[in-house]
């Protein structure tokens, strides 16, 4: 309650933080470290352990709470004309290489995250894993407010929640 958390200038994100009792403050990403250092904010959201370690944010905090509420997708795109100019065999080769690269990238990302997590813990920061069910319940009003306004309908939210539950 009352934790000042760095937020994007997004009503959706601000409402999400408010729903769990936090005080969202819009802070530019480049000002995040200094804002933690000067106690303008108490927390940073939406960052990975890679960013936490690389940005040295762990130097300014005592705790990291693993909420897993953000997922940062990476995209590979190709010009449609270029794709269509490839033979079906070449398209198959490109798709296979992409699929293999995705698996490899995920493996490497998890390895780096584990290394960074260990380094952060070794620096004296306590990492806390939380049961996010309470947070998800608090977010229901946010889902209700934004469903249909950001390109996601109620059915999509239900499917995401079901997929998430299956992973637990």
Regions found by a protein language model. Give the residues of each.
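N-terminal secretory/targeting leader peptides
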Residues: 1-168
């Amino acid at each position: 309650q009352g934790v000042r958390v760095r937020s994007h200038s997004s009503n959706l994100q601000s409402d999400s933080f408010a729903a769990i009792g936090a005080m969202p403050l819009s802070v530019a990403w480049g000002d995040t470290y200094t804002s933690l250092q000067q106690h303008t904010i108490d927390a940073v959201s939406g960052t990975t352990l890679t960013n936490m370690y690389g940005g040295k944010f762990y130097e300014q905090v005592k705790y990291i709470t693993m909420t897993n509420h953000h997922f940062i997708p990476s995209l590979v795109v190709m010009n449609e004309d270029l794709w269509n100019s490839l033979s079906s065999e070449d398209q198959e080769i490109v798709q296979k290489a992409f699929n293999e690269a995705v698996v490899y990238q995920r493996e490497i990302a998890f390895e780096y995250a584990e290394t960074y997590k260990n380094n952060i813990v070794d620096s004296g920061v306590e990492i806390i894993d939380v049961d996010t069910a309470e947070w998800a319940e608090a977010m229901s009003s946010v889902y209700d407010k934004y469903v249909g306004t950001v390109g996601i309908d109620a059915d999509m939210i239900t499917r995401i929640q079901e997929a998430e539950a299956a992973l637990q």
